[in-house]
UniProtKB/Swiss-Prot annotation:
This is Demethylmenaquinone methyltransferase. S-adenosyl-L-methionine binds at T62, D80, D100, G101, S117. Keywords: Menaquinone biosynthesis, Methyltransferase, S-adenosyl-L-methionine, Transferase. Its EC number is 2.1.1.163. It holds the Pfam family Ubie_methyltran. Methyltransferase required for the conversion of demethylmenaquinol (DMKH2) to menaquinol (MKH2). The gene is menG. It is an enzyme of class 2 (transferase). It comes from Corynebacterium glutamicum (strain ATCC 13032 / DSM 20300 / JCM 1318 / BCRC 11384 / CCUG 27702 / LMG 3730 / NBRC 12168 / NCIMB 10025 / NRRL B-2784 / 534). GO terms for molecular function: demethylmenaquinone methyltransferase activity.
């Protein structure tokens, strides 16, 4: 896929994920060698949720991430642009809402915290998406972004790039109902900002005090920030 193809129409992206919903969770576990479960747990811990807080899980997909967040005792809402993905998680006992990350169907200052896992890349204008997440978060509320990032060990980074370019697309063709979604994944990861670059973008688009924690040598980074009080 050419780099220009990453500028997909939002409805094309939603349709692509509609097609992979049924086997999405299993495919992710296989392709991440089981690390996806660890990353979900660390995201919950990083967000530091309290019982009774109201939390938005944006780009929640099949709501497997929302169920993990709900272990904290917080009230969690799964929101995704793909109806097919949400339908694939219909048996997961959390609230589910279809919504566009650039026009969220929630009032201002609705949530104590918001998180988005591996979906910020898929928002057509991710900067507008960051501002929209800030809009629906209460002043002083928290953001955690879990996203694929830049490995911090050079030798490992070389191996990882080889995996993205060659092995991941081949593996996706073997286990996924729509391999194109994972080819898009590999290309969009390579085009994504580094940890420091993303932190700057977050601080410039509705949030402050952004820092990050690397997971699995930087394959994934958890960026956390606060919505200013004023």
């Amino acid at each position: 896929m050419a780099k220009a193809d990453l500028d997909k129409d939002p409805f094309d992206v939603a349709s692509m994920f509609d097609d992979v919903g049924k086997n999405y969770d299993l495919t992710n576990t296989v392709l991440s060698f089981g690390q996806d479960r660890v990353w979900r747990k660390r995201t919950r811990q990083r967000l530091d949720l309290k019982p009774g807080e109201k939390v938005l899980d944006l780009a929640a997909g099949t709501a497997v991430s929302t169920v993990e967040l709900a272990k904290s005792g917080a009230f969690c809402v799964a929101c995704d642009f793909s109806q097919g993905m949400l339908a694939a998680g219909k048996d997961r006992d959390v609230s589910k809402v279809v919504g566009d990350g650039m026009q969220l169907p929630f009032a201002d200052n609705s949530f104590d915290a918001v998180t988005i896992s591996y979906g910020l890349r898929n928002i057509h204008d991710f900067r507008a998406g960051l501002k929209e997440m800030a809009r629906v978060t209460k002043p002083g509320g928290r953001l955690t972004v879990a996203e694929f990032s830049t490995p911090v060990i050079p030798v490992f980074g070389t191996v990882y790039k080889e995996y993205l370019m060659r092995l991941l697309p081949q593996a996706a063709r073997a286990v996924s109902s729509n391999p194109e979604a994972y080819i898009y994944l590999a290309d969009s990861i390579r085009a994504w900002p580094s940890q420091a670059e993303l932190a700057r973008e977050i601080n410039q688009n509705g949030w402050s005090d952004c820092g990050w924690q690397n997971l699995t040598f930087g394959i994934v980074a958890l960026h956390s920030a606060i919505k200013p009080e004023n």
